[in-house]
């Protein structure tokens, strides 16, 4: 899928005359995941996929260094980048396992500017690091999906599927050491708290894997036989939970996050009820802003230095076809130059929302 997406997007870019030919920035992405399909979640691969497409279209030299889910290797990559005789212009990194401050320190000798995506530096960490462009002046910005509001909408869709039954919810989020796990879980707890009579039976931490999702859900469904809603913080764990529900013959609705191909097929077949998608675009949106920054347009003037992008999209059987027309096997290419103020000087504000994207491509 990666090579096909890149071929289509690159061909489309070549077919459309560019309206700008700015400076070509060099960007290194310190990916916490792995390039191996069996070792990295589909969302991680898709994020790199769309960053590669965006870089090719915009005119960015992108290099990806994979850490294989080892935060110490991620820090060593940062140290190696800082020691380069020819440093990149920008380094994009993820606060996976709370490692961003260590990478800030590792990259301090480098003139490269730093941009955090996906998993933000937490408020607690910021008491030591300060905010963007303060203690670390070359840390120029951050952008992350608004996971809390996105999960709130996802659980609302699961609730709608329950009909009149009162919510008896179970939740499986990611590792405690990863800030995004708690952000996603907060969407579940916020929604349950907003509904009179709803109850969250238990929320547990997982390791993002389908096997762990199955194990956790199997135990929880046995412990809470009245549970009727299972939320998981990614599609892999959701698929495992769905298998556990089938094994228990439990009448539950199950939702995940990521837009994984198997999850979409499961929704079409009446298995999963919903998934929350769009995380795979956060790196591409960051590259749009960095390209503009490299060419004299500072994104800080439009949305600030620390951005929570509330664009995540709930997919159910109702809107599955529309979503697959854009991101499925027969996807239409996204032209990321349309979102750049360098390529489109008429843009007054960045708009990274999902609805216009779907409308434009369908």
Locations of the language-model features?
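Extracytoplasmic "Venus flytrap"
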Residues: 25-50, 54, 63-76, 94-98, ...
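Flexible loop/hinge segments that line or gate small-molecule binding clefts
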Residues: 106-148, 263-266
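Hydrophobic alpha-helical segments within soluble ligand-binding/sensing domains
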Residues: 74, 135, 140-168, 259, ...
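Periplasmic-binding protein-like
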Residues: 85-95, 113-118, 170-171, 203, ...
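Venus flytrap/periplasmic-binding-protein-like
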Residues: 114-127, 231-273, 281
């Amino acid at each position: 899928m990666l090579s096909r997406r890149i071929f289509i997007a690159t061909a489309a870019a070549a077919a459309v005359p560019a309206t700008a030919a700015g400076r070509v920035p060099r960007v290194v992405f310190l990916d916490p995941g792995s390039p191996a399909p069996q070792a990295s979640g589909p969302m991680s691969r898709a994020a790199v996929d769309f960053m590669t497409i965006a870089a090719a279209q915009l005119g960015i030299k992108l290099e990806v260094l994979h850490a294989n889910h080892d935060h110490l290797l991620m820090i060593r990559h940062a140290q190696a980048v800082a020691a380069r005789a020819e440093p990149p212009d920008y380094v994009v990194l993820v606060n996976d396992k709370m490692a961003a401050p260590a990478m800030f320190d590792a990259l301090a000798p480098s003139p490269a500017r730093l941009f955090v995506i996906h998993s933000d530096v937490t408020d607690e960490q910021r008491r030591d690091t300060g905010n963007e462009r303060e203690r670390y002046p070359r840390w120029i910005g951050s952008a992350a999906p608004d996971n809390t509001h996105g999960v709130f909408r996802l659980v609302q869709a699961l609730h709608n599927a329950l009909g009149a039954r009162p919510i008896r919810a179970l939740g499986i989020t990611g590792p405690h050491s990863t800030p995004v796990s708690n952000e996603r879980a907060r969407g579940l707890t916020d929604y349950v708290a907003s509904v009179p009579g709803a109850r969250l039976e238990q929320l547990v931490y997982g390791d993002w894997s389908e096997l762990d999702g199955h194990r956790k859900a199997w135990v929880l469904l046995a412990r809470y036989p009245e549970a009727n809603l299972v939320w998981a913080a990614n599609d892999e764990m959701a698929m495992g939970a769905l298998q556990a529900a089938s094994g228990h013959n439990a009448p539950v609705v199950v939702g995940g996050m990521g837009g994984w191909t198997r999850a979409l097929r499961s929704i079409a077949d009446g298995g999963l009820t919903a998934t929350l998608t769009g995380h795979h675009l956060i790196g591409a949106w960051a590259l749009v802003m960095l390209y503009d920054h490299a060419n004299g347009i500072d994104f800080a003037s439009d949305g600030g230095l620390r951005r929570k992008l509330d664009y995540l999209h709930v997919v159910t059987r109702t809107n599955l076809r529309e979503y697959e027309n854009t991101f499925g096997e027969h996807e239409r290419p996204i032209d990321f130059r349309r979102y750049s103020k360098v390529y489109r000087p008429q843009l007054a504000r960045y708009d990274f929302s999902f609805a216009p994207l779907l409308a434009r491509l369908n």
